[in-house]
Amino acid sequence: MSRPIVATINRAALRQNLAIARQAAGGSRLWSVVKANAYGHGIDRVWQSLAETDGFALLNLEEAILLRERGWKKPILLLEGFFHPADLEILDRYRLTTSVHSNWQIKALAEAKLSAPLDIYLKMNSGMNRLGFQPEQVNNAWQKLRSLKNVGELTLMAHFADAESTEGVAEPLKRIEQAAEGLECPRSLANSAATLWHPQTHHDWVRPGIILYGASPSGRWQDIAGSGLQPVMTLTSEIIGVQQLAAGSCVGYGSRYRASGSQRIGVVACGYADGYPRHAPTGTPIRVDGEMTQVVGAVSMDMITVDLTPCPQAGIGSQVELWGNSVKIDDVASASGTVGYELMCALAQRVPVQTE
């Protein structure tokens, strides 16, 4: 028998989340963001459940090629663009849309021999200071690209660092409007948070990511609790051992937890080598036999320990939900000082994955 841990991907939830994102986007077209192997869910496993989208946005050429080979004919956007001039031959062959964020990429496009023009997303730095042209550089970069025979449809693209708040989009929007003055151009600005909460950012294309997988862009599940969004990934395991502690007994590496009285604890077949956060402290929520309880002691490579006080009937073989419909991944992440995005992406290869 295999170790009892398994991740389950709910394709119906994925389809529902896409429909909710579509409704939130109004009349805007929708890029479904499937970077990082579809946020750890497996791009080859989930893309068909997102087939009603208008396009896929990702990073890796390998994933773009996979989608084309699987029969996807609608647009694919490379969010970080191409990394070497030689990549343009691949973009041409597979008809990929690319972001452009640096002058060297404009030069490469000017010099490339392509069979047909490529659609381009000109990336503006709206204040996040990662990729993109500064606002005062946008017009010049736009005009250069517009003059190239290798450039087809040209779209202005930007990203919000703080779209969870109204203030977080107001100032970047001002910069974008100033930079785009006089340019007749489609725009793609909205990430998940902006798609849900800031319709003034929607424009021509929105780019939802984390909400497709049923977690909150703010990191707070309560912010999307009434939206209809559903967790797509559920991570479950079983109790594989039980210990009866006396008062003063310690648990796990570093003896970080000490029982204040007589207490039963369960040992769960899941650890940080499976992608569970190593820094999850005592008190992190977990569900055993349908009852909410908590992690106690340090997370080990292959095991965690949980308090069985709320579920005295639990024993060997009892079902454990680490995150999913009942234990929100955002709550586990928040307790552990991280975000749901990271936990999804950190799911280890050794964890079996099934779909339903």
Swiss-Prot record:
Q: Which GO terms describe its cellular component?
A: cytosol
Superkingdom of this entry's organism? Bacteria
Q: Give one GO term, molecular function aspect.
A: alanine racemase activity
UniProt record, GO biological process: D-alanine biosynthetic process
Do the record's keywords include Ribonucleoprotein?
no
Q: Which cofactor does it need?
A: pyridoxal 5'-phosphate
Per the record, what are the reactions this protein catalyses?
L-alanine = D-alanine
Q: Which PROSITE patterns match?
A: ALANINE_RACEMASE
Q: Which residues bind substrate?
A: R130, M301
Enzyme Commission number(s) from the entry: 5.1.1.1
Residues modified as N6-(pyridoxal phosphate)lysine: K35
Keywords per UniProt: Isomerase, Pyridoxal phosphate
* Active site, per annotation: K35, Y253
* SMART domains, A to Z: Ala_racemase_C (SM01005)
Under which pathway is this protein filed? Amino-acid biosynthesis; D-alanine biosynthesis; D-alanine from L-alanine: step 1/1
HAMAP family given in the database record: Ala_racemase
> What does this protein do, in the record's words?
Catalyzes the interconversion of L-alanine and D-alanine. May also act on other amino acids.
Q: Which family does it belong to?
A: Belongs to the alanine racemase family.
Q: What is this protein called?
A: Alanine racemase
Species this chain originates from: Erwinia tasmaniensis (strain DSM 17950 / CFBP 7177 / CIP 109463 / NCPPB 4357 / Et1/99)
